[in-house]
From Swiss-Prot:
Species of provenance: Drosophila pseudoobscura bogotana
Similarity-based family: Belongs to the complex I subunit 1 family.
Identification of the protein by name: NADH-ubiquinone oxidoreductase chain 1
Example of a GO cellular component annotation carried by this entry: mitochondrial inner membrane
UniProt lineage: Eukaryota, Metazoa, Ecdysozoa, Arthropoda, Hexapoda
Enzyme kind, highest EC tier: translocase
Length: 163
């Protein structure tokens, strides 16, 4: 019974994260619209509120294309794996109701975020394009350099919280 409740809680958390990301992109589009002295997305529904759902439907119904010389399986699996990793990181966040409580949550967070580097590298490599590979390697180098500073800041916060 406890497993089913934690599974339902995890699915509810993932759905809430996806919906909040959709509405944050709507907020971003609205703010950018007002910066450019226009209203932003307002054609769908009341004040454009159903716009993220319409965008999701449009993205899921678009024709799937892939480069002719690409490695088909890794070309499609790497972005999906990246999405699952970014959603999996939310499981260790402490909320009012702890879904998964364990002592090494910070280390789990750093491990999951560092696995995202491999998805970018595989996505760049699997397209069999030199430009995509170079872009992927640049993104990997940038992500690794950001992870080092994130880990140092996190460890400093942990160190000073015990003093």
């Amino acid at each position: 019974m406890e497993f089913i409740l934690s599974l339902i809680g995890s699915l509810l958390l993932i759905i809430c994260v996806l919906v909040s990301v959709a509405f944050l992109t709507l907020l971003e589009r609205k703010v950018l619209g007002y910066i450019q002295i226009r209203k932003g997305p307002n054609k769908v529904g009341l004040m454009g509120i159903p716009q993220p759902f319409c965008d999701a439907i449009k993205l899921f119904t678009k024709e799937q294309t892939y480069p002719l010389l690409s490695n088909y399986l890794s070309y499609y699996i790497s972005p999906i794996f990246s999405l699952f990793l970014s959603l999996f990181v939310w499981m260790c966040m402490p909320f009012f109701v702890k879904l998964y409580s364990f002592n090494l949550g910070g280390l789990f967070f750093l491990c999951c975020t560092s696995l995202g580097v491999y998805t970018v590298m595989i996505a760049g490599w699997s397209s069999n394009s030199n430009y995509a590979l170079l872009g992927g390697l640049r993104a990997v180098a940038q992500t690794i350099s950001y992870e080092v500073s994130l880990a140092l800041i996190g460890f400093k916060i942990l160190l000073f919280s015990f003093l």
